[in-house]
């Protein structure tokens, strides 16, 4: 989609004309997010977001309309902007349902979908002051021309138009997580709610998002591959720099230079007993010689996330106690992955992993009773994965897996320092997590390139040439023997 040069400038006043285009080339309109014209290195013609074409977005909307009862509306708001302080926002992340259905990566809009009207988008109206502070954003023109909305209005028209749509609908589905007062405060919405006509949309959208299309799988594979490369580089680096904060910074750097827009979540980098805190996030401690470090990380690539965990000894050698416990988690990881196939459920995988882990922990004398198992592992063996890290959370774990589902397999054990067990096991936390695509015949491990065998990890850590200057400048990693930079802006390594 090419925008004309006439759109390049925006009148600030009668006498003053200021161009605020972040990507001004005199021929390309800035709509506040990449387009094939503004970012040809990222996007091919016909794509609305990198890797996903307009036909796919239209197909998703058609499927959602088919799932809606007759004469129903679906209202999906973009995610709210969260402020760090005063006028300074946190990095914006779009609501996954809104992104899935519209392709719009920006805040301030509300999308409404119905059989009668198709996609109707209410878009933000920027003032010159907004543009001066935040740059150009997608408005009504972009809604029609880029996102291919059937109808597009400025957001100020929402109360009048949406009220009328709600009044004429028998049911209103909406995205509760990102619900906006722009519509929940409308009298007609509140009347519908009081009559029991307002329903949750996520049960429908999460259903659609469970099965990934070929284009989505390409992005999921790429996201997983970036996570594997980033974690491997960080693992190698850990021998010279056993520090949670440095490793957290490095894994983010390694993912972002490979094209990821952000991490899928704040990485968990727990050294020693910090690894027994499941979602440890402080990442502020040195890792003691001989301790393990657990790193749970993932990145987001054009809306699709990865989720990967490895646990290793930065010193390069597992102790015999660490090896014994690690082997139990590794065997459980591998056995559960082997069970992944159409028809199996996450619940069944969880039951299987609980049996394996309980048996092992009892045999090692760590558990005195199977009843205590949940004190050492309160987590599920896995979850669905996609646009969100705990994706399609409205779908339960009793759903038979189908080709195109992506799930995680993440057995772990988290032994608090105070747990009543032989002292040598106290304060150890181990998790090994992979991303698994369900195929017609079984599975494909998307994170299979990241080593997890003890001998492979030890070999890698002990045959790696370190560059000490990397402590102050991660870029100098490219000077490490055997690594080469290339100048492709999407892929630096
Ligand atoms: N890796 C984060 C989680 O699964 O909760
Ligand atoms: Mn996970």
Swiss-Prot record:
Cofactor(s) the protein needs: Mn(2+)
Class of this enzyme: hydrolase
Entry annotated with the keyword Transit peptide: yes
UniProt-annotated binding residues for Mn(2+) 1: 307, 383, 410, 433
Cofactor-binding details, from the entry: Binds 2 manganese ions per subunit.
E.C. code: 3.4.11.-
Coiled coil: none
GO cellular component, one term: nucleus
GO biological process: protein stabilization; proteolysis
GO MF annotations, alphabetized: aminopeptidase activity; manganese ion binding; metalloaminopeptidase activity; peptidase activity
UniProt: Mn(2+) 2 binding residues: 296, 307, 433
Alphabetical keyword list: Aminopeptidase, Hydrolase, Manganese, Metal-binding, Metalloprotease, Mitochondrion, Nucleus, Protease, Transit peptide
Transit peptide: 1-19
SUPFAM superfamilies on file: Creatinase/aminopeptidase, Creatinase/prolidase N-terminal domain
S-S pairs: none
Knockout-associated phenotype: No visible phenotype. Altered mitochondrial protein stability.
Family, per entry: Belongs to the peptidase M24B family.
Function of the protein: Aminopeptidase which cleaves preprotein intermediates that carry destabilizing N-ter amino acid residues after the mitochondrial processing peptidase (MPP) cleavage site and is thus critical for stabilization of the mitochondrial proteome.
Protein name: Intermediate cleaving peptidase 55, mitochondrial
Organism of this sequence: Arabidopsis thaliana (Mouse-ear cress)
Gene: ICP55
